[in-house]
Amino acid sequence: MNKEILAVVEAVSNEKSLPREKIFEALEMALATATKKKHEQEIDIRVSINRKTGGFTTFRRWMVVETVTQPTREITLEAACFDGEKVYLNDYIEEQIESVDFDRITTQTAKQVIVQKVREAERAMLVEQFRKYTGQIITGIVKKINRDNIMLDLGNNAEALILREGMLPRENFRPGDRIRGILYGVYPEARGAQLFISRSKTEMLTELFRIEVPEIGEEVIEIKAAARDPGSRAKIAVKTNDKRIDPVGACVGMRGARVQAVSSELCGERIDIILWDDNPAQFVINAMAPADVASIVVDEDCHTMDIAVDINNLAQAIGRNGQNVRLASQISGWELNVMTTEDLHSKHKEEAHTAFNFFKKNLNINENIIKILVKEGFSSLEELAYIPFNELLEVKNLTEDQAKKVREGAKSKLLLMESDKNKMIIQERKTEKELLKINGMNAVLALQLAEKNIFTIEELADQGIDDLTDIKNLNSEQAGLLIMTARNICWFSSKV
C-alpha cells in the first residue's frame, strides 16, 4: 500500500503538472475524510503521510477552547493541561488511532476527495499562472459557442470566456477560429469560468497599439487617453517623450500600416489618433478632429466647454448619433456642448444680459462698471467677493477705488443674503417646534415633515395617510395616528 501511495502521487503529479506536495495534501485530506465516515460521531481527523516511505499515521484531535460546544471535537484548556503540557487556546490535542483499511467504500471516498482536491489545485495554479497577464492581450481558439458567450481554449487545459458584451457588434466566430482579446478578469471561484477576455474594452485598443508601435513599448511615445465605441469608432491620444519623433505619424505608420493593422483586428473600427496637449482647451480642439473648432469657452467651475463650429461643420463635429462629440468628451473628461458660432454668440449675449441685471439688482454701482465686469466674464457675487484683489485690479478700465467698492458691495450683499437665509431657517424651526406639541412627534420626524413643506399642526391635519407613507421609519398606522391627533387639536379643541 505504501508503494501504491507513492506511485499515485508520482502519476497524478506528472499527469496534472502539479507539485507532489499538493497531491500528498489531497491524499491526506482524502484519508481523513474516509476515516471520519467510519465513525458514528462527528470527530476531527488528521492524517500524516511519510513523503519518503508512503506510510501514513492517523490522529484524532480536539481543539482547545474556553467553552466546549462540540464534545467530540473540542476540549477545555484546563483538561488539555491536565498532564502538565504547555497548551494554548486554539491549539490541538492529538491522539494516534488505528489507520483505516482500504475497502471498497474507503477507496471510493478517497478517490472522490482526491479528484476534488486535484481539481481545486489545478484551478488555483491556473489563477496564479494567468494573474500576471491581466491587462494584456492573449490568444485562444474557439472551443464552444453559446448564445451569450464563447469558450476559448488557451492551451494546457486552460479555458477562458468571452461574454456577449465583450464581443464587437456583427462579429461572428466558428469553432477553431483564433481570437485575440484583453484578459481583464482572473477569478479564483471553485466553479464556473475563471478567466474572462474582452475585445470591446478600451484596454484592447491601447494594447494593440503597444504591440504594433515599438516606440510605445520603448516609452518613447506615451498613450495618454483613449475612448471607444466598440466596432465603430475610437479616439486615442498620444504624446512623445522625444521631440524628434512625431507621435501621431509613428502610430499611423508608413502608408497607414500600423493603424490599419489595429483597425483590421477590431473589425474595421475607425481610429482617430490625436495629439495630447496639457492645455485642456487645446486638447479638446484636437479631440474634436476631423471637425474644425471656431472658438471654445471653458467653464472650469462646471467642468464644461462650449464649442463653436461653423454651421457647415456642425454635423461633422457632432458625428453620427453624437458619436464624435461623445468620444471627445470621454477622452478629455470634460462635458462638451457643441453649437454653431451664432448659437454661442446668442448664448453668451443672454448670459451677459442675465449677469448685468443680477449685478444691477444686487450691487449699488455704476452701470458702466457692471458692463466692464460682465465683459470680463464675472457672473456671481462670490467671484467678485473672493477673487484675489490683485486679479480684480487687472480688469481693464477698472480703477483701484472702483475695485474696492465692487468687492465691498459683493461681500455685503452675500452677508445680507446669508442673514436672510438664517432668518428663514429660524422661522422653519419655529414651525417645527409647533409640530413637537403633538404626542408621538420627535425632532427628526418634524424635520422630515418640514422637508415636505408641512410646518404647522393645521397643515398636518390637512394631509392624508398616503401623503406621509414615504417618510422613512413611519408606517401607515403611525401616520394615521399623527394626522388624527392634529385634527383633534385643530378641529375639536380650542387649545393645545
Swiss-Prot record:
Primary localization class, coarse: cytoplasm
Coiled coil region boundaries: none
UniProt xrefs under Gene3D superfamilies: 3.30.300.20, 5' to 3' exonuclease, C-terminal subdomain, Nucleic acid-binding proteins, NusA, N-terminal domain
Recorded GO MF terms: DNA-binding transcription factor activity; nucleotide binding; RNA binding
Domain of life according to the entry: Bacteria
Cellular compartments annotated: Cytoplasm
Complex and partners: Monomer. Binds directly to the core enzyme of the DNA-dependent RNA polymerase and to nascent RNA.
Function per UniProt: Participates in both transcription termination and antitermination.
Family, as annotated: Belongs to the NusA family.
Listed name of the protein: Transcription termination/antitermination protein NusA
Gene name in the database record: nusA
